[in-house]
Amino acid sequence: MEGPLTIPVLDKGFVRLVDQMGDDRAIVQAARVSYGEGTKTVREDAALIDYLMRHRHTSPFEMVVFKFHVKAPIFVARQWFRHRTASVNEISGRYSILKEEFYEPEAFRKQAKRNKQASEGALLDEEALALLRKVQQEAYGAYRALLEKGVAREMARMVLPLNLYTEFYWKQDLHNLFHFLKLRLAPEAQWEIRQYARAIAEIVKERVPLAWAAFEEHLLEGAFLSRTELRALRGLLTPEVYEKALSSLGLGGSRLKEALEKVFGPGEAL
């Protein structure tokens, strides 16, 4: 792998690609263990990866692993670590004196009226930003004062706020990394973690372009339909109309047949 790729995020954070095991070829090689020798060209590799993605054959994607070095506010890291399939190692406030680095947003956001866990719109309030700076400065001052009094680092850190920056290494396989991106790129995800997800997406798109294209087509920009939703679609569409629409978008052959069967079932598809 080439030298480290670092993308700045927020005011003081970053995402850095530390290491990578495998690429698009590793996905294809893993699949061929199951399917035998077959595809050889890039076009055929892309078709195989697309097939694996749309049929939810996940294990070949787990053969690719990314390791990132991340610097993010603690409140972002706590959301991040909810994705428990990764291997994580974070800087320790027990062993190290934590730096005076805080995330300061350009503006606060207002509480969303319809979603208790979301925000909306900008709240341009200089007094609110001044209050944030005052509290974080006082908290870090108390932290240093406790250390100077001989209080253990593991206890002195209790006074530090959640907008303090932390750093961690995060190692994740591509299948679960795509799941992370599906959730954290979504509009309802908190704005701050979306910026980190976008940085990771930029790296992943460059490193595994065929897998990214399949992910974007079937998961990131795709949707799952419930039984009720399928019934509603069947009431509005005919196989003929749907086939014409799919064909106009360039879908043909087995992919066209598969798409028709997804909505109308094997017995009704043309």
Curated annotation (Swiss-Prot):
Enzyme class: transferase
A GO molecular function held by the record: thymidylate synthase activity
A Pfam family that the UniProt record links to this protein: Thy1
GO annotation terms (biological process): dTMP biosynthetic process; dTTP biosynthetic process; methylation
Named cofactor requirement(s): FAD
E.C. numbers: 2.1.1.148
Reactions the enzyme catalyzes: dUMP + (6R)-5,10-methylene-5,6,7,8-tetrahydrofolate + NADPH + H(+) = dTMP + (6S)-5,6,7,8-tetrahydrofolate + NADP(+)
Keyword Transmembrane helix carried by entry: no
Pathway: Pyrimidine metabolism; dTTP biosynthesis
Span of domain ThyX: 13-218
InterPro entries membership: Thymidylate_synthase_ThyX, Thymidylate_synthase_ThyX_sf
Family of the protein in this entry: Belongs to the thymidylate synthase ThyX family.
Function as written in the Swiss-Prot or TrEMBL entry: Catalyzes the reductive methylation of 2'-deoxyuridine-5'-monophosphate (dUMP) to 2'-deoxythymidine-5'-monophosphate (dTMP) while utilizing 5,10-methylenetetrahydrofolate (mTHF) as the methyl donor, and NADPH and FADH(2) as the reductant.
Protein name: Flavin-dependent thymidylate synthase
